Amino acid sequence: MKYYAIGYATNAALPDVTADDAQKLTHMNLAFGLIKDGLLDMSQLTHIGLTEQFRRWNPALKIVLSVGGWGAGGFSTMALTEEGRRAFAQSCLEAVEQYNLDGIDIDWEYPCSDQAEIDCDPRDKENYTLLFKALREALGENRIVSTAVGAGDYFVRDTEMDKVAQIVDYVQLMTYDMRNGFTHQAGHHASLSASRGDTTNTNTRYIVDLFHNAGVPLEKLVVGAAFYARHYTGAANINNGLLQKASSGIYGPDYGEITEEFRRENGYTEYWDEDAEAAYLWNGSVFISYESPEAIRRKCEFVKEKGMLGVMYWEHSADPTRELLGVIADTLHTK
């Protein structure tokens, strides 16, 4: 089976992409296009011209424009009418043709929710499906239409994933930030399994079963990996801080910073939670949840065991060592 290795890369990350990176990836998601006045806006992607070089390095590389991201609004209003959906889909087609892209990825965070302080509507549930229908009709069967989805029961509740799965090429599970800025308990934000005593359902195995049971075929599921950490302060020095009451999970540090400044330095000790199949750092009061090479490898092996499509990660620039991408490529044999 040919597995996918999909990397999200922001505009700022594109100048640092190397030939070796391009050859290890099967897909690159450009982050992000936005919605402005109901149409696709790509004005912030100033380095998109570099993608032609990426194709020369790897002619098989699929380059997909991802639209949305955390705090990106405009989806609900645009998707409310058939006219709005068609106009947006047409603007996506024009961008795909202009920049020689392979498709469109939708990262709507989240339908039916104003959690990210964006517009929402109860009709988002049905309109989410209709948006993908409009994109498929505009882009045709030979271009990629994909989605990135929140890793929780709320996303399944607020969408029609069984219908969406019939339209899109694949569904990317954002199996990170499962513990986040709204969580006040130190724990793993991207773990494969659950820690002993953790009953929160914030682990990849649970999320895969959740979306599969909601109607997404395993062969269309892509598991997410995090190239960054979340840290919690004020945790009690019990069980190395794991599952202790703490501050909310704050973004950072990136994996590159972990390798340079935190791992076995600055008072931090690295630990492995075998139950959760996840790594973390602890210094007596600060708990840092991150994905180590072994954690990434186990996610990749899990993908292979379950017959899923592959692994994607956020975000390319967060690991300048390229150690984690190397683990993905080696385990999934993408290079």
Residue ranges and their predicted role:
Residues 1-96, 113, 326:
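Glycan-recognition patch characteristic of GH18 chitinases/ENGases
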Residues 9-24, 81-98, 153-163, 204, ...:
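Short, acidic/polar
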Residues 28, 65, 106, 135, ...:
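Conserved, mostly hydrophobic/aromatic
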Residues 67, 225-302, 331-335:
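Glycan-binding loop/region signatures in secreted carbohydrate-active enzymes
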Residues 36-46, 90, 111-260:
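Substrate-binding surface in catalytic domains of secreted glycosidases
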Residues 317-335:
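Aromatic-rich peripheral "rim/lid" segments of glycoside hydrolase catalytic domains that contact
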Residues 27-31, 96-113, 146, 174, ...:
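Short acidic catalytic loops
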Residues 2-3, 24-26, 59-63, 100-104, ...:
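Short, well-ordered coil/turn segments that N-cap beta-strands
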